[in-house]
Amino acid sequence: MNYLSDLHTHTIVSGHAYTTLMENIDFCSKKGIKILGTSDHGPAMPGSPHYWYFGNLKVVPRIINDVIILKGCEANILDVDGNIDIPNNAMKNLDYMIASFHEPVFEPKSLEENTNAILNAIYKYDKLEILGHLGNPNYELDYDIIVKKAKENNIMIEINNSSLSGGSRIGSNVNCEKVALLCKKHGTKVILTSDAHINLKICDFSKSIELLNKIEMPKELIMNEPDKLIAHLKSKGRLQDL
């Protein structure tokens, strides 16, 4: 398995993570990790940076120490209309966005409202590439329609190792398996992520791989091989400088 890409990682800029961007890059370089996606929390999350931070990611070189850097954000879904907390003038400088629910920003609502919030975000934002930690048991969701719409819009579903390891969003395991099985059923692309808040966890996909092996997820749906991931993003007009 050549799963040497991780698009859900955090730096000290998120306010509750513990390594810098350069420390993350150096770790990846030493470990042979080929693609690092840096995706700090959007500004609506307590402790997170001003949106200028995301707009200014343009100053970060594309390749540092042989590691390809993808400039992203874990954007917060703000409301049922699917609005997120990254303005267009900052979004234009990003390679991708993850859209996620976080309890301090979006209080869990009904199944219909939670589902509509995600669907509306899918429809609104071209830079949305990944739906984050859908297995969170605090948010009831219609997984089937979300996975179908992700497939129709060529959006990846995250298989979040932190959720499965019990480090975050306790009780996500059952829902994560449901989501993964629906991705297999509908042919929706998935991406393994660490959700690392310290560099030692970058590309730790151990629990995610266990789950995908258990359900016999087709390898062609797993997007972590660097060449496959770059081809996917280029097919959507991204990464034209690679």
PLM-predicted stretches and their roles:
Residues N2, G42, G47-I159, N213-I222, ...:
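Extended substrate/RNA-proximal surfaces in nucleic-acid metabolism proteins
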Residues H8-I12, H41, H133, H197:
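Histidine-centered divalent metal-coordination motifs
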Residues G15-T19, S48-H50, E140-V147, G167-L182, ...:
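Histidine/acidic-residue-rich catalytic or RNA/ligand-binding cores of hydrolases
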Residues M22-L36, V59-R62:
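Alpha-helical scaffold segments that flank or form the walls of functional sites
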Residues L36-G42:
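Short, conserved active-site loops that position catalytic residues or coordinate cofactors/metal ions
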Residues H41, T188-I202:
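Short acidic/histidine-rich active-site segments
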Residues M156-S168:
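His/Asp/Glu-enriched short active-site or ligand-binding loop at hydrolase and phosphoryl-transfer sites
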